[in-house]
Amino acid sequence: MMDTRLSEDDLAFQVEVRQFLTEAWDKELAATYGNIATMKEGAEEWPTRLYHKGWVAPHWPVEYGGTDWSVTQSFIYNSERAAVGAPEVLPFGVTMVASVIIAYGSDEQKEKFLPRILKSEDWWCQGYSEPGAGSDLASLKMRADLEGEEYVLNGSKIWTSYAQYANWIFCLVRTDSSGRKQEGITFLLIDMDSPGITVRAIKTIDG
């Protein structure tokens, strides 16, 4: 019969996690995060507190700042985090683009972006959906044409959460239209301060 009880080391880890979360996810931060007017401040402060503890990116390889937690430790952390109502770190930087950079990025890209993601020095947003391409990303039309050493982009993205805060966007664009529509799609990292980028708000029911 399987023994599902926590080991002494895991119990000690649970105590450490519980104590940290009790102190780090305080009422003031929870209120800041839960208010749409101050959400940006809260969404920056929470991962900063996790960073100083060394827990902002537990799923990363240790060499880049991960924790090497066991499956049980990850379960303990997420269970305790949920119990106090603390959110996951916004996924765009620490989970989505970082995973791609770690797996496929050059050494230069890793050195440039990963430390800044860990320290929450960059806000990332996701540029996938387009006015005519949502769930079917193979239908995307935003073009990126290589001119010299730079790509020139033409097109629009939509439903780009937190674009109003972001200084970087990871974007799917079409670099080749000669094959099937599922081909010729490239993943680009784009500085939101690049010339020609305009961010427009979409009014939603919650303001």
Regions from the PLM with identified roles:
Residues M1-F92, E108, K112-K119:
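Amphipathic, small/basic residue-rich leader segments at the start of a protein or domain
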